[in-house]
Amino acid sequence: MTTILKHLPVGQRIGIAFSGGLDTSAALLWMRQKGAVPYAYTANLGQPDEEDYDAIPRRAMEYGAENARLIDCRKQLVAEGIAAIQCGAFHNTTGGLTYFNTTPLGRAVTGTMLVAAMKEDGVNIWGDGSTYKGNDIERFYRYGLLTNAELQIYKPWLDTDFIDELGGRHEMSEFMIACGFDYKMSVEKAYSTDSNMLGATHEAKDLEYLNSSVKIVNPIMGVKFWDESVKIPAEEVTVRFEQGHPVALNGKTFSDDVEMMLEANRIGGRHGLGMSDQIENRIIEAKSRGIYEAPGMALLHIAYERLLTGIHNEDTIEQYHAHGRQLGRLLYQGRWFDSQALMLRDSLQRWVASQITGEVTLELRRGNDYSILNTVSENLTYKPERLTMEKGDSVFSPDDRIGQLTMRNLDITDTREKLFGYAKTGLLSSSATSGVPQVENMENKGQ
């Protein structure tokens, strides 16, 4: 059976991921007029720029949807976001600033929950607004087929008939007006924005050019921290984790993770925390650029990793970072529920996150400028008395350290012999100023 349909399947049910924007509105109306039976599905992901979710299904019905459903995905989205924090599932960083994979997390939830709802309604053809150059077309493809093995894909934006008739936003707006809907195009921004409760992505248009900076972006989850006219007073915040799970902010315990994430967003957003500018590799290996917001994720991540470094040993922390980066890449590629990802998630949550209990107090200032003021945990292996420089009882003596250093002679001797062996083969050069062979200076080599 053909998985991807290039032309409209007339007379058949088609589920469309309906945002209520111009593109999906025009596509839904066009499909109905051409003889398909569209069903509209809207994911409530807690988008910070969406004012009225209940109005979206009503609009879909007006445009010709056979049925329209609003699917509340917020609880699952936050659960996956917390899992990503527990696992450090983030692989894109620049200068120490992290992209928290908020769009990939949203796609994992949307792609599974909407297709599951479609399956309940007997809808086995799915359409969405992703383009053929982006990551989402592959993410939705994978998650959709994982959820429904009988699923077929129809995307109006890959249908030449649709493109010929409604190839641009102006044509779509004119089409809606001609059909009796007073649909005005929204004011065009200098970039495109996609968001959910975990974060916002700003990309494309002017942001494709690297001489356009974060300063052209109007944050939707935070403030313009780079604008000196914006007053941002310093603020102390305390985050508490229990067995890897964030449970309290500033002493207030949350039984609802959605409410906890909303409050974390409010706190971090007041400072512009978690905003970053990233050049990344898309799934197809072409580079793209995005400016991201994730105030709540950033706040929780900082506190989590502070506890992590005080609780776990060096080798465990090294594995956390290595496996987290690997898992982050799988998440980015739309493989969050693949077996290799589940294996990594299980080990990181079981053996790392389960021990993360305690409180971290921070002072937030402007943007990503903050200080850690205090760290408290019953699980800390950080024991200042072990290494104190003050006189007193010690867990080991000077003689113990002499013995430990003497044992190092074994590998130091081996290393010295290897260095001189490399020099004999020409890999290293002898140095008049050093007692050991050195890597040859390339400038001298060319003279």
Swiss-Prot record:
Subcellular location, record wording: Cytoplasm
Residue numbers binding L-aspartate: T131, N135, D136
SUPFAM superfamilies in the cross-refs: Adenine nucleotide alpha hydrolases-like (SSF52402), Argininosuccinate synthetase, C-terminal domain (SSF69864)
This protein's record includes keyword Nucleotide-binding: yes
GO biological process: argininosuccinate metabolic process; L-arginine biosynthetic process; urea cycle
Pfam family, one: Arginosuc_syn_C
EC assignment: 6.3.4.5
Entry's Gene Ontology cellular component terms: cytoplasm
GO molecular function: argininosuccinate synthase activity; ATP binding; protein homodimerization activity
Gene3D superfamilies in UniProt: 1.10.287.400, Argininosuccinate synthetase, chain A, domain 2, HUPs
Residues reported to bind ATP: A17, F18, S19, G20, G21, L22, D23, T24, S25, A43, G129, T131, D136, D194
Binding residues annotated for L-citrulline, in chain numbering: Y99, N135, R139, S192, T201, E203, E280
Domain of life: Bacteria
Keywords from the UniProt entry: Amino-acid biosynthesis, Arginine biosynthesis, ATP-binding, Cytoplasm, Ligase, Nucleotide-binding
Pathway this chain belongs to: Amino-acid biosynthesis; L-arginine biosynthesis; L-arginine from L-ornithine and carbamoyl phosphate: step 2/3
Keyword ATP-binding: yes
Known catalytic reactions: L-citrulline + L-aspartate + ATP = 2-(N(omega)-L-arginino)succinate + AMP + diphosphate + H(+)
Subunit structure: Homotetramer.
HAMAP family linked: Arg_succ_synth_type2 (MF_00581)
Family: Belongs to the argininosuccinate synthase family. Type 2 subfamily.
Protein name, per record: Argininosuccinate synthase
UniProt source species: Escherichia coli O139:H28 (strain E24377A / ETEC)
Source lineage: Bacteria, Pseudomonadati, Pseudomonadota, Gammaproteobacteria, Enterobacterales
Gene designation per UniProt: argG
